[in-house]
């Protein structure tokens, strides 16, 4: 599944993205973020991070620098969420 998602994102970046107007409000772009997240965390957790990022990419969000979290940062976020439940 991970490999398939990576192939689809690379296809999008190479063939679809160049013909669309630049609209991503973030750096790295949402497709680059998704690729890095899936490579780092796998299809499920990386996919969730990618979806959350894409949902934040809209005209009412100022955007800016938003890198994929490190494994340590991601683990801290997961632990905080579990404590708050």
Curated annotation (Swiss-Prot):
Keyword tRNA-binding in record: no
Origin superkingdom: Bacteria
UniProt subcellular location: Cell inner membrane
Membrane topology reported for the UniProt record: Peripheral membrane protein
Keyword Membrane included in the entry's annotation: yes
A GO term from the CC aspect: plasma membrane
Chief site of localization: membrane
Pfam families given in the database record: YidD
Swiss-Prot/TrEMBL keywords: Cell inner membrane, Cell membrane, Membrane
PANTHER family, per database record: MEMBRANE PROTEIN INSERTION EFFICIENCY FACTOR-RELATED (PTHR33383:SF1)
NCBIfam families: membrane protein insertion efficiency factor YidD
Family that this chain belongs to: Belongs to the UPF0161 family.
Role: Could be involved in insertion of integral membrane proteins into the membrane.
This protein's name: Putative membrane protein insertion efficiency factor
Species of provenance: Dictyoglomus thermophilum (strain ATCC 35947 / DSM 3960 / H-6-12)
